């Protein structure tokens, strides 16, 4: 009997051995699970559409909170107009799904006219040049399409415009440049390295002459009428800067961004059975 006790001395009872084994197994399984979870790519999240609350429940201008807010908007618009003489005229509106709940028009329609009676007045039908304000709409459409899963910001341009190509080269440290693809994110942030306009003008006489400066057709080059002409124009010239190094304002890049939105939206609607040809 004594020899049996000596043999078991320093060892835990058998039931404790079983518990230690189970605990070790649980710890190993837990460690393996978290290791796999952390090392595996995160699954793509389903991104639901934003709730269309204001389409179904439109704001009413006679509601006290809305009325107070609109009065504050009107005060801000008028004060800003009178404090900024460089603004000739403006039209501002707050529009809901059921129409405008606030409108104001300030300033002359033709501020450069000599005779005051010829200047007219701005109203809701006055036409203003949208210019680079259109970039906001292009970017908003890109963000909406990303939310719907129709595109990703790091998608290369060639995924949506297969004919797109560009030239690298012309820099002092050319061998150190990463010649990766230009992506949607690069276009949206003006980090593509593209110049402002394509095609470029002929500036052989610079600095003695500014001939050839500016966008087409003012630079002497024909204005690109089609997407193909814009894309081909880009492929004929090297980038101003390597991609992702420094922001360069590019109207051409934004034009491509808008076309990508058109292509991505059409593909998304086609996958849902929408007749995009209508």
Swiss-Prot record:
EC number: 3.5.-.-
Statement: the UniProt record of this protein carries the keyword Transmembrane helix: yes
Residue ranges that the Swiss-Prot or TrEMBL entry lists as coiled coil: none
Domain of life, per lineage: Eukaryota
Membrane topology: Single-pass membrane protein
Gene Ontology molecular function, alphabetical: hydrolase activity
Bilayer-crossing regions: 20-37
One Pfam family named in its UniProt record: Beta-lactamase
Free-text biotechnology note from the record: The structure of strobilurin A was used for the development of the major class of beta-methoxyacrylate agricultural fungicides since its beta-methoxyacrylate toxophore targets the Qo site of complex III of the mitochondrial electron transport chain and prevents adenosine triphosphate synthesis. Compounds such as azoxystrobin (Syngenta) and Kresoxim methyl (BASF) are among the most widely used fungicides worldwide. This class of antifungals are used as effective treatments against a broad range of destructive fungal plant pathogens and make significant contributions to food security.
Enzyme class: hydrolase
GO (cellular component) term, any one: membrane
Localization annotation: Membrane
Sites where a glycan is attached: 112
Record keywords, A-Z: Glycoprotein, Hydrolase, Membrane, Transmembrane, Transmembrane helix
Major location category of this protein: membrane
Pathway membership, UniProt: Mycotoxin biosynthesis
Family, similarity comment: Belongs to the beta-lactamase family.
General function of this protein: Beta-lactamase-like protein; part of the gene cluster that mediates the biosynthesis of strobilurin A, an antifungal polyketide that contains a key beta-methoxyacrylate toxophore that targets the complex III of the mitochondrial electron transport chain. Strobilurin biosynthesis begins with construction of benzoyl CoA by step-wise elimination of ammonia from phenylalanine by the phenylalanine ammonia-lyase str11, oxygenation by str8 and retro-Claisen reaction to form benzoic acid, which is activated to its CoA thiolester benzoyl CoA by the dedicated CoA ligase str10.
Descriptive protein name: Beta-lactamase-like protein str5
Organism: Strobilurus tenacellus
Lineage: Eukaryota, Fungi, Dikarya, Basidiomycota, Agaricomycotina
Gene name for this UniProt entry: str5
